[in-house]
Amino acid sequence: MEQNVLNTDLTGKVAVVTGASGTLCSIFAKALARAGAKVALLGRNMEKLKALADEIEAEGGIARGYTCNVMNKANCLQVAEEVMAELGSCDILVNGAGGNNPKGTTTKETLEKIDLAQQDPEVKTFFDLDPQGISFVFNLNFLGTLIPTQIFAKDMAEKGKGCIVMV
């Protein structure tokens, strides 16, 4: 197994990582496993989750992939039950699921007065944002963090200890 970059021993701890099939959180998951944690990999793409779990286990770690929609409380509850049965109760939660949507973002970093006067369909300003796109981004980034935290932090609260990382 590669070097433990966290420089800590997490043996016996269970880490739940949302957004684990993404670039950033897959690296976090590997680091947690290298520190000795059993890692629950939550994400939308089971193929990527399985590949990551296989990679972690090939290095001697313990990891399981779970398809999870972090905006769906019932789905998160079901996954939490599976994690508890297979790995144990959550000690560490990394909330890494999130993202953006073209309907919920502008095409330019800054607004210029000329953008208001032009009718360029390639330029989307704050004033052109689609409320449904904004709603999706809000739900993904806010509710997609709130719901897993409500579910997995309950174990931590009952134990009186734990760690939550917001990415």
What are the roles of these predicted feature ranges?
Residues 149-150:
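A short, exposed helix-loop element centered on a Lys and neighboring polar residues
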Residues 11, 59-62, 82-95, 101-102, ...:
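A glycine-rich helix->loop->beta "capping" turn
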Residues 13, 61-62, 89-90, 114-121, ...:
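Active-site loop of short-chain dehydrogenase/reductase
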Residues 110-146, 161, 165:
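Catalytic Tyr-X3-Lys loop
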Residues 14, 21-23:
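Conserved glycine-rich cofactor-binding loop
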Residues 46-47, 67-79, 131:
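The beta1-alpha1 cofactor-binding region of Rossmann-like NAD(H)/NADP(H)-dependent oxidoreductases
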Residues 17-18, 95-98, 162-167:
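Structural signature of the Rossmann-like NAD(P)-dependent dehydrogenase/reductase core
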Residues 37-51:
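Conserved glycine-rich Rossmann-like NAD(P)H-binding loop of the short-chain dehydrogenase/reductase
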